[in-house]
């Protein structure tokens, strides 16, 4: 596959600035901060934009826009290396699994994904090139690696983390365009959107005018995610009010560290935990004064699968179902 790339002038300036500052990227699977600042507390599925771009017809060459600018893919790839778990899941969901040669160490879903020891955190150009890829798909946290791959003529597609659900649908369709699976990708994007909306509307019907408060706990040190993040917007669709939005550093990257005192004072109705196991739920209940927190009192501390709660691929519906069930349980009390 031959890919040509055109960088926008604005991005060239940004790249130089980042290089000069010595900025390092963070984890590749962190979804980018969204522009939405606070939860709306209105329960309901998001409306589709009127200007949604149509998907291509599946022919090559095809030109798309990634995090680095315009990319032209001359022909359908046959040896894809995916270093992003979210994109790996999407590739298989749209029928491009047979075109995937290798995936990174954390791309563990679906089972048939050819998981290797390739790192998505610190990608190694030499290790990647050993798979003789005709397309490498990277997170935008690995821009330096992407530029190195392009420099040695390895076709590369750099996709940013989703900031909202519309990004999920758009990236699903984009992957369909660059792999030649446009019809399957369009069908999959429609499925995700339809099923997500159905889950939300079912929960909203039971919730009525009730507004529940919550926070998602990312680790035992009480780091959380605000409504300005991708995962925060999933909860926002259910009309939940995120107490993390009120945290002192809630506007600092969208991932504030809460204190036990803050949580007790805010008294959330629901707590979602995306790490650990059932013993973690017990440990949370034993924290000082947490026995007075509504979520603990009402057995409304819910354990989430960490992968499902952080990836923006086809399993975003599974994430919604977990949240929806928790909302319906609390609404019935």
Where are these predicted regions, by residue range?
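Extracytoplasmic ligand-binding site segments that recognize negatively charged/polar headgroups
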Residues: 144, 159-174, 208-234, 279-281
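Alpha-helical, coiled-coil/dimerization segments enriched in small aliphatic residues
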Residues: 107-108, 224-254
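Short helix-initiation/N-cap motifs at beta->coil->alpha
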Residues: 67-68, 116-126, 249-260
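Proline-aspartate-enriched helix->loop->beta-strand connector
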Residues: 77, 124-138, 154, 259-273
């Amino acid at each position: 596959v031959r890919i040509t790339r055109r960088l926008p002038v604005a991005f060239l300036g940004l790249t130089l600035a980042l290089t000069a500052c010595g900025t390092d990227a963070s984890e590749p699977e962190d979804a980018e901060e969204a522009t939405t600042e606070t939860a709306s507390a209105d329960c309901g599925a998001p409306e589709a934009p009127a200007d949604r771009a149509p998907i291509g017809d599946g022919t090559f060459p095809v030109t798309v826009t990634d995090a680095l600018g315009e990319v032209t893919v001359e022909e359908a790839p046959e040896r894809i290396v995916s270093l992003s778990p979210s994109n790996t899941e999407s590739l298989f969901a749209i029928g491009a699994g047979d075109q995937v040669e290798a995936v990174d160490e954390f791309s563990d879903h679906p089972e048939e994904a050819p998981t290797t020891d390739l790192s998505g955190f610190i990608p190694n150009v030499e290790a990647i090139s050993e798979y003789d890829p005709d397309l490498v798909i990277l997170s935008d946290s690995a821009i330096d690696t992407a530029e190195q791959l392009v420099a040695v003529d390895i076709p590369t597609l750099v996709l940013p983390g989703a900031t909202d659900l519309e990004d999920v649908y758009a990236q699903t369709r984009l992957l369909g365009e660059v792999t030649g699976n446009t019809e399957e990708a369009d069908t999959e994007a429609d499925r995700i959107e339809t099923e997500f909306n159905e889950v939300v509307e079912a929960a909203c019907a039971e919730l009525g005018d009730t507004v529940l408060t919550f926070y998602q706990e990312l680790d035992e040190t009480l780091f959380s995610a605000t409504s300005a993040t991708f995962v925060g917007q999933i909860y926002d669709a259910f009309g939940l009010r995120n107490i993390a939005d009120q945290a002192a550093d809630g506007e600092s990257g969208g991932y504030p560290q809460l204190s036990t005192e803050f949580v007790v004072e805010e008294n959330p109705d629901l707590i979602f935990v995306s790490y650990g196991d059932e013993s973690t739920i017990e440990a949370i209940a034993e924290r000082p004064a947490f026995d007075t927190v509504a979520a603990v009192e009402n057995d409304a501390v819910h354990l989430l699968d960490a992968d499902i709660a952080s990836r923006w691929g086809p399993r975003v519906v599974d994430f919604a179902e977990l949240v929806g069930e928790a909302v319906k349980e609390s609404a019935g009390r």
